[in-house]
């Protein structure tokens, strides 16, 4: 990712198309602009989006794998009902906690939301930190059978007990041709390959799926990645986790347990929920409260590192350092780029 410049003469990689390829530039005039706003947990994405939307007549699509669930409010830092009344939001509170929701579901619903917003001459703003959902939106839905959460849980336990290298060796025995195309450290692809073999009875290399192109290729996508200093983000996360607990996160977890969150292995493993589910299962011992709180904070910090690493792989997300900038200023910079190049 690279930090952009904000002035009338600035040329981003997208803007340079005007100079390099007139035909491509002409075709792009007919593309509708979609804003992608990403960043690590605690970077201020929500505040920026709420200020950006009125500036460009936009509506917001959540790119958060847990905000789709009703009742998972405090632990996901879900935007308030008042703000959702003021600015339309999509893909929030659309599922019961026992329902499964995956990247394929996200893709089709996000595309539908974009079409809805654009049909009214407004601007879709996709906001969130779930990297794989952004990847799916940009690249098209994953091919193959839907995920099997129970099978994935078994593989996760296997990795915990025996290590990822042994699981990779297992894949090498079952599908050596595919195994040679990935690294022994690529946990996601190893798990997905074994899952496909388990569900279809065929090797991954035997399948001849045709990749479905993403409909977002019809859009002029302009992406941003909010990048606060790491030290400042750690402090923000500490305060954020503390505030969630003061806002009765543990009571929220109790309510979700009664609603059956355990039946959803994805939701029950979400950071901010899995730690306190374990705490409750242990009988909520007072002496372990501080240790669990620290684990909650540490897990969140580790997740932000993964988010930074993930988005660095996608040059469409231009890094926007946020040190010393207010949410209003950041939103104004993104709006300026939209009016210059959108």
Curated annotation (Swiss-Prot):
UniProtKB keywords: ATP-binding, Magnesium, Nucleotide-binding, Transferase, tRNA processing
Q: Where is this site: Interaction with substrate tRNA?
A: 130, 152
GO terms under biological process: tRNA modification
Question: Annotated region Interaction with substrate tRNA: where?
Answer: 64-67
Highest taxon of source: Bacteria
Q: Mind listing the GO molecular function terms for this protein?
A: ATP binding; tRNA dimethylallyltransferase activity
List, alphabetically, the Gene3D superfamilies matched.
Answer: 1.10.20.140, P-loop containing nucleotide triphosphate hydrolases
Annotated substrate binding sites: 41-46
Recorded coiled-coil stretches: none
Quote the record's binding site residues for ATP: 39-46
Its needed co-factors are: Mg(2+)
EC code:
2.5.1.75
User: What NCBIfam families does the record point to?
Assistant: miaA
Spell out the family assignment given in the record's similarity comment: Belongs to the IPP transferase family.
Q: How does it assemble?
A: Monomer.
- What is the annotated role of this protein in its UniProt record? Catalyzes the transfer of a dimethylallyl group onto the adenine at position 37 in tRNAs that read codons beginning with uridine, leading to the formation of N6-(dimethylallyl)adenosine (i(6)A).
Protein name listed in UniProt: tRNA dimethylallyltransferase
């Amino acid at each position: 990712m690279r930090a952009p410049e904000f002035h009338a003469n600035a040329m981003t990689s997208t803007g340079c198309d005007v100079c390099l390829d007139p035909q491509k530039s002409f075709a792009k005039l007919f593309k509708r602009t979609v804003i992608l706003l990403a960043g690590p947990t605690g970077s201020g994405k929500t505040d920026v989006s709420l200020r950006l939307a009125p500036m460009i007549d936009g509506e917001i699509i959540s790119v958060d794998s847990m905000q789709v669930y009703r009742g998972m409010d405090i632990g996901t830092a879900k935007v308030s009902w008042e703000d959702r009344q003021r600015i339309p939001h999509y893909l929030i509170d659309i599922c019961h906690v026992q329902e499964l929701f995956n990247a394929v579901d996200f893709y089709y619903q996000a595309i539908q939301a974009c079409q809805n917003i654009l049909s009214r001459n407004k601007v879709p703003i996709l906001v969130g930190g779930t990297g794989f959902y952004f990847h799916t939106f940009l690249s098209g839905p994953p091919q193959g059978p839907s995920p099997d959460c129970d099978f994935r849980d078994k593989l996760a336990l296997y990795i915990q007990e025996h290590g990822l290298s042994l699981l990779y060796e297992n894949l090498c025995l079952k599908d050596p041709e595919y195994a040679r195309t990935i690294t022994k450290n690529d946990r996601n692809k190893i798990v997905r390959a074994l899952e496909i073999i388990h569900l279809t009875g065929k090797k991954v290399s035997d399948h001849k799926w045709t990749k479905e192109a993403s409909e977002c290729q019809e859009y002029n996508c302009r992406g941003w990645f909010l990048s606060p200093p790491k030290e400042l983000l750690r402090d923000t996360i500490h305060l954020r986790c503390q505030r969630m607990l003061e806002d009765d996160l543990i009571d929220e977890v109790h309510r979700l347990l009664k609603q059956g969150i355990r039946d959803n292995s994805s939701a029950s493993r979400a950071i901010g929920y899995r730690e306190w589910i374990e705490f409750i299962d242990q009988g909520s011992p007072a002496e372990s409260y501080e240790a669990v709180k620290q684990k909650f904070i540490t897990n969140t910090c580790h997740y932000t590192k993964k988010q930074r690493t993930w988005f660095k792989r996608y040059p469409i997300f231009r890094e926007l350092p946020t040190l010393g900038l207010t949410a209003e200023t950041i939103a104004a910079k993104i709006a300026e780029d939209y009016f210059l190049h959108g």
